[in-house]
Design a protein with these regions (language model features):
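Bacterial N-terminal signal peptides that target proteins for export
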Residues: 1-8
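N-terminal signal peptide c-region/cleavage motif recognized by signal peptidases
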Residues: 16-19
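Low-complexity, acidic Ser/Thr/Pro/Gly-rich terminal tails and inter-domain linkers that flank the onset
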Residues: 22-48, 126-139
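Terminal connector regions
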Residues: 28, 98-141
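Short solvent-exposed strand-capping/beta-turn motif centered on an Asx-Ser/Thr pair
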Residues: 50-54
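Short acidic/proline- and small/hydrophobic-mixed sequence motifs that coincide with surface turns
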Residues: 56-59
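Hydrophobic beta-strand segments
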Residues: 62-64
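Intrinsically disordered, low-complexity Pro/Gly/Ser/Thr-rich segments with frequent PxxP/GP/PP motifs
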Residues: 67-105, 115
Length: 141
């Protein structure tokens, strides 16, 4: 995996997503890497998150690793996707600093660092995840 650990929470912006952008699997929390675009010295990443479960996720923090074209880990990110209401599709943006989009080969969801609903911590969030990519860069876990 990539060298260097960055545990700063990525700044996530919420944007209304069109329903056609990502239809998730029933009963799953689908996370799609939809697009990467250059943003200065960073690579802006667009995640489409579709909560097709009945779980009102109050907090979801992913343990995300960024791999370069040589298969070497560039960065570790604790990605806070924030609230993910059931039956909703949302877009989250985050910047991967100091790396060009063309240098990224793969994003690995290594696990779930934190997952909470209104009743507190949940242990099943990782099992609910379905990962996919439309960005020409693998998103797997």
């Amino acid at each position: 995996m990539r060298l260097g650990i960055v545990l700063g929470l990525a700044a996530a912006l919420t944007v209304a997503a069109s329903g056609a952008a990502a239809q998730g699997e029933a009963g799953r929390l689908t996370i799609e890497l939809n697009k990467l675009e250059p943003q200065g010295e960073a690579c802006r990443s667009y995640l489409v998150i579709d909560n097709a479960t009945e779980v009102a996720v109050a907090e979801l923090v992913l343990d995300l690793y960024v791999f370069n074209r040589d298969g070497v880990i560039e960065r570790r990110i604790a990605l806070d996707t924030r609230e993910v209401p059931p039956g909703k599709t949302q877009v989250r943006l985050f910047d991967i600093r100091d790396i060009g989009c063309g240098e990224i080969e793969r994003l690995l969801v290594n696990g779930v660092l934190s997952c909470r609903d209104a009743d507190g911590e949940r242990s099943d969030c990782e099992d609910l995840l379905a990962l996919r990519s439309r960005a020409g860069v693998d998103l797997d876990g």
